[in-house]
Design a protein with these regions (language model features):
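Extended, highly charged clamp/arch subdomains and adjacent linkers
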Residues: 1-26, 45, 68-72
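Conserved phosphate/pyrophosphate-binding and hydrolysis machinery centered on Walker-type P-loop NTPases
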Residues: 2-7, 30-33, 84, 88-91, ...
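Conserved, well-folded catalytic cores of nucleic-acid-processing
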Residues: 16-20, 46, 74-81, 86, ...
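Gly/Thr-rich phosphate-binding beta-strand-loop-beta motif of the actin/hexokinase/Hsp70
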Residues: 21-49, 147
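Short glycine-rich, Thr/Ser-proximal phosphate-binding strand/loop in the N-terminal lobe
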Residues: 42-62
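Conserved phosphate-handling catalytic cores of large alpha/beta enzymes
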Residues: 63-84, 89-192
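Accessory alpha-helical DNA-binding modules that contact the DNA backbone or grooves
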Residues: 190-326
Length: 326
């Protein structure tokens, strides 16, 4: 029974981590509460925090008008696209307030599962990441980032706090931890990580990337803005050719300059991918579209014609069919 339960947790965790990201948006995270006020944080499309605030629109203070002004000012100042509301205490009340505030704007709102956000806010990792923020501000950031890139944010939290199952504390903790850790690695290897939203915790799971390299990638992104292509990684401090070769197939870019940068196809196989597409009458522009028909291919024959290994071809086709977790 225990093994079965661990299996169920692993499956639930995998589903949570594979949830679709919401890329390219500016998001306002809203951590709802009553007495202590609602904490707000605005993040840009790379997850960088632009501003935080605290408002009291709920009971007992009911400062709805003042709160509305703060929220509308933030929306205007940063061109906010979406508000992510945590689903904890005062979530329903917050939802009503938000719906009312944004009714004359093009902003949308989404309720986000905030399980584990408070555990993260009080963690050593959050202290390192946001030394100057209080726990409420950290929670609001975490809620916004969960909507933007669930995988990047959830890997910061002990899987047992994300609420993936009941009675997990009665189990063999070593087995449970190994199983859940394995899930994260598998997801990272299967779908890759978005180079422009990945947290340092997530980058640590990528082959070849150490803790310090992960921090350097984040610093580079904060200073220079989004990565436009994978090759830019070579500009990151202490990230040499060898590390690039190890990690390049697992880091992806949304809306990249080179369409293959949004797949887990390794740059070393780009020529092979282009040759294959060309042979089948497609171009790079067809990637991810419905035009691309890649079923029932004769891999042996293609392998001979293109001088590319069968396994490499199969991997390329698998990726061309599904760039990432959309």
């Amino acid at each position: 029974a225990e093994e079965k339960s661990i299996e169920v947790f692993a499956k639930n965790l995998s589903q949570l981590l594979m949830e679709s990201p919401l890329s390219g948006k500016t998001i306002l995270g809203w951590d709802p509460a009553f007495r202590t006020g609602c904490k707000l944080a605005v993040i840009d499309s790379t997850g960088k925090v632009l501003e935080t605030s605290l408002i009291y629109p709920t009971e007992p203070q009911n400062k709805v008008k003042e709160s509305e002004k703060v929220v509308l000012d933030l929306i205007k100042k940063y061109d906010v696209d979406v508000i992510a509301i945590g689903n904890g205490t005062a979530s329903r009340e917050s939802e009503e307030i938000v719906a009312n505030i944004i009714k004359n704007t093009s902003v949308e709102y989404i309720i986000v599962n905030e399980a584990g956000a408070s555990v993260y806010s009080a963690s050593k990792l959050a202290d390192e990441e946001f030394p100057d923020f209080n726990e409420g501000e950290r929670s609001a950031v975490s809620i916004a980032r969960r909507l933007q890139d669930p995988l990047a944010e959830l890997v910061k939290i002990d899987p047992k706090s994300i609420g993936v199952g009941q009675y997990q504390h009665d189990m063999n903790q070593k087995q449970l931890n190994e199983s859940l850790g394995g899930v994260v690695e598998r997801v990272v290897n299967e779908v890759g990580v978005d180079l422009n939203t990945a947290s340092s915790s997530l980058l640590n799971y990528v082959s070849g990337i150490t803790k310090s390299t992960a921090k350097n990638i984040i610093s580079y992104r904060e200073e220079n803005g989004k990565f436009d292509n994978r090759k830019e990684l070579l500009n990151v401090k202490k990230l040499g050719k060898k590390t690039f070769e190890q990690c390049a197939g697992f880091v992806k870019i949304d809306n990249p300059q080179h369409p293959l940068d949004n797949t887990t196809i390794h740059p070393e196989s780009y020529d092979a991918a282009v040759k294959l597409l060309d042979k089948l009458g497609y171009t790079l522009a067809d990637i991810g579209s419905n035009n691309l028909k890649l079923d029932n291919l004769d891999y042996e024959e293609l392998s001979d014609q293109l001088d590319i290994g069968v396994i490499t071809l199969q991997d390329i086709v698998k990726e061309l069919k599904k760039p990432g977790r959309d």
